[in-house]
Every structure is written in C-alpha cells, then in structure tokens.
A protein has these predicted regions:
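Conserved beta-strand positions in repeat-built beta-propeller and related beta-rich domains
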Residues: 1-11, 55-59, 89-94, 133-139
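Beta-rich, blade/repeat-based domains predominating
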Residues: 1-3, 37-51, 96, 116-130, ...
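Histidine- and/or cysteine-centered catalytic micro-motif in compact active-site loops
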Residues: 2, 9-11, 19-20, 37-41, ...
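Short, conserved, GDST-rich strand-edge loop motifs in beta-rich repeat architectures
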Residues: 58-94, 141-144
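Structural signal for beta-propeller blades
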Residues: 12-14, 61-63, 99, 139-142
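Short acidic/glycine-rich loop or secondary-structure boundary segments that cap or lie
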Residues: 13-15, 25, 42-46, 54-56, ...
Length: 146
C-alpha cells in the first residue's frame, strides 16, 4: 500500500502510516516513527518523483522548551504563542537547518537547507532542479538548488 508521512511538531518526528489505515494514534500500532530527533519542529512535507522526502522546519529546536516542557501542555502553549514570542524561543541561527531532504529508499540524508533568510519555513515544494520555500512573513517564495 501507499505510505502517508505525517509531521509531529510536539515530538519533533515524522510518522509513517499506511494510507489506508483508520483511527491511528501517533506511536500506536501501525504507526511508526520514520524519522525522529529532528533538529527542528517539522511543518510542511513534500515528496518528489525520485522518492525524496523534503521536511521543512517551522521553528528551530528550542533548548529551553525541550528542557522545560515535561508536559505536552507547556509545549503546546509555546508552539501556539504569539509570533514575537515564538521568534525569541525558536529563532534559527545561520547554521540551523530550515529544511532537509532524505531518501525514502535508503533513509540517507541528502541535503540540508540553512540560513536566516529561510527562517520559519512554512511550506516546501520540490520542482525539477529547485526547491521552493514559503517562509513566514515573506512576500515571495525562496528557492534553492537541489
């Protein structure tokens, strides 16, 4: 069957589930973590025709949040805070990934997209030799070679 990939902000992972499955719980029977311990909070996902999964990170991993968020309640509140608060908590550094590409066939990480210009990546779309990003607050799409 077909596989559906689901991003989980709270757990910083990507779940893989059978697309025909019904009533699944993250981490439950029939739902496996395809990619865990990600360097950011995953948002948009896209798969190209070559079988590469593109993961955009809505925010960078927050050491403060990971240290203090013992419950999903605090993590959920922080992830739903106002934009100014989120930028202070989750601001990407110049070397922090805003998106990554991973081969679904081999599980190998193929490319990392970094830089403050692509901070807070809300959408990702691979097209031929380019990857386009929709960044929060940007008036136009950003592009990178793949």
């Amino acid at each position: 069957g077909s596989t559906l990939y689901v991003s989980d902000l709270g757990s910083r992972c990507i779940w893989a589930v059978d697309a025909a499955a019904r009533e699944l719980t993250a981490g439950g029977r029939g739902c496996t973590a395809a990619f865990a311990g990600l360097p950011g909070y995953p948002g948009a996902l896209a798969v190209d025709t070559d079988g590469t999964l593109y993961i955009s990170y809505r925010w960078a991993r927050s050491g403060w949040l990971e240290k203090n968020a013992d419950s999903t309640l605090l993590r959920g509140i922080a992830l739903r805070a106002g934009q100014n608060t989120q930028e202070r908590l989750f601001r990407c550094t110049a070397d922090a990934p805003c998106a990554e590409a991973v081969s679904l066939a081999t599980g190998a990480w193929e490319q990392t997209f970094t830089g403050l210009v692509q901070d807070s990546c809300a959408a990702v779309c691979p097209v031929e030799s380019k990857v386009y990003f929709g960044a929060a607050g940007a008036d136009s799409l950003l592009a990178a070679n793949r």
